Amino acid sequence: SDVCSSDLNTAALENYLTFQYSPCTETFFKGVYKLPPAHYFIYKNGKLDIQQYWEIEFHADEKPSLDDWVNQISDTFHNSVEAHKIADVEVGSFLSSGVDSSYVAAIADVDKTFTVGFGKEERYNEIGWAKGFSEAIGKKNYSKVIEPEEYWAHLPMIQYHMDEPLADPAAVALYFVCNLASQSLKVVLSGEGADEIFGGYNVYSDPGSTSYEKLPRGLRRGIMHIAESLPAHRGVNFFVRKGKDLEERFIGNAYMFTPKDRKALLKIHTNAPDPMAITKPYYDQVKDQDDVTKMQYLDLHLWMAGDILLKADKMSMANSLELRVPFLDKEVMALAQRIPTRYRVIHKPSESGGTPYITKYAMRLAAKKDTPPQTAKTAAKKKLGFPVPIRVWLKEDTYYNMVKNTFEGNAAQQFFHTEKLVQLLDDHRAGKADNSRKIWTVYMFLVWYHVYFESDVIPTKPNV
């Protein structure tokens, strides 16, 4: 292809199947490397010297009270938002129903907020909530409902702009909200980074597992080995997962194909490292920290750089839009790394007798404090992410057939055992398993591969 003449790095493909993004420094193009986050290089006299210039260092400060932390978060975040608003042009703000973007929008005091959604179901469409929130803070909300056909039609162009394949369905939604905002301004604020630095992902709480983890490690390992021999289902998977140490089971927020499953799926042999070989250097840096902090540290170095910020940067730049992230200000980071774990993820029994864990606890209290009373309930809202109805679409004839044709095409036959790909698709359609994320991971690679290695035409915005 004239788009890119480099050879494909098949080791990157194998790791992508597990992580849903490219986690290593060598890219999908053999011999082309990425500079690691927070590093710089000097090339002099034929030698390349790569140095790290910044690193997060979690060290809990036990002296301040919870109220003190809440006030510090509030003050520091206000300063960050004000600094990120400085511009010669109008600034807007993205808005979902989550606490992160709501906190940004409420403090920023911008005139315009932007939201996208899918269909009419509330779990896939936050537009109604965003409009209500915007009205409560006296701002104008601009929104767009993304139709399935335009979502799918934009995939080649979006994978082109990503440079490397990314299987996060939210990247497409992010493209559309960036496009919406770009029609009226050039700079937006967004809420990326809050989950990683303040402890916001649901997996950090892993509710209901702590009692089991108090059992002796040897007993849990024994139960795990028995469970591994049984047919897979939710209960069995719990015992398999909880028999493993954190370093074995957590590689970040996405875990698509296990090393065993990806090797069974691939027709080609690669020299890809095991996922644990990729994560081990990061875990080694936080050996003495608790599990929540270990997960945050890993996500900050892999997930945030390889998925969250990558798609934010690529999709905004594809629309000539500057996206700014006030949660990732160095002063906010310096504060967050000192907050004790018990104020990041808190176990708070409910009146009904349940044992819920509240993530991002101190930050949620700061958001509640700084948000108008009629909108403060967002601070307690369960995290949704950026919901996309992929699992629903893959059961519909149009998109099932579209993916199946790709899974049986020449590129798929080159890299995969295609009968196993089709089996994943058929089992999903029949309701035997939710394989939507696995299917999407493979499909996005094949869409990307077609753009960069099979097509001579750079994809442009479709007329849908």
Locations of regions flagged by a protein language model:
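Membrane-proximal basic amphipathic "stem/tether" segments
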Residues: 210-254, 443, 459
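Gly/Ser/Thr-rich beta-alpha loop segments that engage phosphate groups in nucleotides
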Residues: 33, 94, 99-100, 193-195, ...
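Short catalytic/ligand-binding loop motif for oxyanion handling, primarily in non-cytosolic enzymes
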Residues: 61, 101, 196-200, 205, ...
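Donor nucleotide-sugar recognition loop
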Residues: 165-169
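Active-site adenylate/phosphate-handling loop in enzymes that bind or generate adenylated species
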Residues: 176-234, 303, 309-332
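Adenosyl-5′-phosphate
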Residues: 4, 31-37, 47-48, 170, ...
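Short low-complexity, flexible loop/linker segments enriched in glycine and/or proline
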Residues: 156-160, 182, 204-206, 391-393
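Cysteine-centered catalytic environments shared across enzyme families
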Residues: 1-162, 174, 178, 368, ...
